[in-house]
Amino acid sequence: MAIKRTKAEKKVAYDKKLCQLLDEYTKVLIAVADNVGSNQLQEIRKGLRGDSIVLMGKNTLIRRCIKVHADNTGNKEFLELMPLLVGNVGLIFTKGDLKEVREEVAKYKVGAPARVGLVAPVDVVVPPGNTGLDPSQTSFFQVLNIPTKINKGTVEIITPVELIKKGDKVGSSESALLAKLGIRPFSYGLVITNVYDSGSVFSPEVLDLTEDDLMEKFASGVSMVASVSLAISYPTIAAAPHMFLNGYKNVLAVAVETEYSYPHADKIKEYLKDPSKFAVAAPVAADSGAAAPSAAKEEEKKEEPEEESDGDLGMSLFD
């Protein structure tokens, strides 16, 4: 016969378990567990078994344990979890990939009926079509202003109807109608709201970022740093190439306007004094590109006389 532990003993065991998890793990997912049943939670635990542990409990108890652990070990990083312990939340300690764990948790959402008084997490739309209900059930549709018609002895909804809006409470009429139609519009499961990793807390959307997204953000940041550096004339690695180029342009402009001379500036001065050189430079590039085809044509012309001489030689044999 199992010995029933007292409330104090349970609290001591819980503190010991949580402190052990804080020592072993550096990654934690904070999840809201509203409307999640014990059987559903058990299935989630089974699915995560191996590299993750789901811990539920009272927020005050978890806060106290985290604070005691920080005082005893000197590790203050987990104190970042304290402000996140609000409402019906649980902690998922993991050694696996954070994104994969979040995706695994999302698999265990289950459909739920629209019970009276629940706040709708999503819009509920009743689709058009045959309901399979007999004409005596039309009162439900009339109360909710749903257009219907009788088709082959059953009630048929003519157009799609937005029955419940997101954020509204479910009324008795809406709940009864959805139950008769066999519609379970809501789905509940653990919802990851925050991610903790080695002292840093961030939104779960960060887990969806790809390498391309990071490279785009990095390139945008480098471009912004370069722009600011150029604007305030502050040298940085990002702005250095542009600063050298702008400086060279300024030196070249001064050399062109004055008698100061150096090889590159002299060449620019020649072009500015005689603009026709710009026109001469372009055909030279074009001619070099056309040289190869013309050479090929000349070779073909040289080969043609050889074929004609062979023909003449053949004709002379018959003479």
Swiss-Prot record:
Single GO MF descriptor: structural constituent of ribosome
Which residues lie within the region annotated Disordered?
A: 286-319
Look up the domain of life of the source. Eukaryota
- Keyword annotations for this protein? Phosphoprotein, Ribonucleoprotein, Ribosomal protein
Keyword Plastid annotated: no
In the UniProt record, which is one GO cellular component term?
cytosolic large ribosomal subunit
Q: Which InterPro entries match?
A: Ribosomal_protein_uL10, Ribosomal_uL10, Ribosomal_uL10-like_insert, Ribosomal_uL10-like_insert_sf, Ribosomal_uL10-like_sf, uL10_eukaryotes
The positions making up the signal sequence are none
Pfam families attached to this UniProt entry: Ribosomal_60s, Ribosomal_L10, RL10P_insert
* The keyword Nucleotidyltransferase is annotated on this UniProt entry: no
GO biological processes:
cytoplasmic translation; ribosome biogenesis
Its biological function? Ribosomal protein P0 is the functional equivalent of E.coli protein L10.
Whom does it interact with, and what assembly results? P0 forms a pentameric complex by interaction with dimers of P1 and P2. Interacts with NSF.
**What is this protein's record name?**
Large ribosomal subunit protein uL10
Q: Can you name the source organism?
A: Oryza sativa subsp. japonica (Rice)
